[in-house]
Amino acid sequence: MGKPNGLKTARKLRNHRRVQRWNDKLYKKAHFGTALKANPFGGASHASGIVVSRLGIEAKQPNSAIRKCVRVQLKKNGKKITAFVPNDGCLNYIQENDKVLVAGLGRSGHSVGDIPGVRFKVVKVSSVSLIAIYRGIKDKPNV
C-alpha cells in the first residue's frame, strides 16, 4: 500500500509528513533546542575565558603523541571546556589565568582526528593572535 493520491488527500499527506519529520535526527536536533543548551558556546562562534590549567592529552591509537591542551572556564556561563593549542611550542605562550579566545575545531559537536574529547581550539591569548605570537610578528603583552 503506497501513499494516498487523488483529490482531497493533501491534508492527510501533510499531516503524515509532519508526524514523520520527528524521526529525522537532524530535524529533531534543530527544533527541540536541546543542542543549543548543551553547546558551551550557546550558539556563538567564539567564546572568551580564563585558562584554569594546562594539560597534555594522549592521542588515540595508532598515533602516539601528547597533544597540548588547556582547560578554559568560559566567561559567559562558567562552563569548563578543553581547548587544543595548535602549532609546535605554542603552549609556552599560554600561562594559567591568561585570557584566551576559543573557537570550534572541525565538525560541529564532534572531536577531531586523534584528540579524544577536544572540540575547541585556542585562537587568541591576551587579545593577541596565537599565530602572530608564534611567528614573531607580535609580542604577548605582559599584563
Curated annotation (Swiss-Prot):
UniProt GO MF annotations = structural constituent of ribosome
Q: Which CDD domains match?
A: Ribosomal_S23
Q: Which domain of life is it from?
A: Eukaryota
Q: What are the protein's UniProt keywords?
A: Hydroxylation, Ribonucleoprotein, Ribosomal protein
Q: Which residues carry this modification: Hydroxyproline?
A: 62
Q: InterPro entries, per this entry?
A: NA-bd_OB-fold (IPR012340), Ribosomal_uS12 (IPR006032), Ribosomal_uS12_euk/arc (IPR005680)
Q: Which Pfam families match?
A: Ribosom_S12_S23
Q: Which Gene Ontology cellular component terms are annotated?
A: cytosolic small ribosomal subunit; ribosome
Please name the PROSITE patterns in this protein's record. RIBOSOMAL_S12
Q: Which GO terms describe its biological process?
A: translation
Q: In which family does this protein belong, per the annotation?
A: Belongs to the universal ribosomal protein uS12 family.
Cited NCBIfam families: uS12_E_A
- Protein name (database record): Small ribosomal subunit protein uS12
Q: What is the lineage of its organism?
A: Eukaryota, Amoebozoa, Evosea, Eumycetozoa, Dictyostelia
Q: Which gene encodes it?
A: rps23
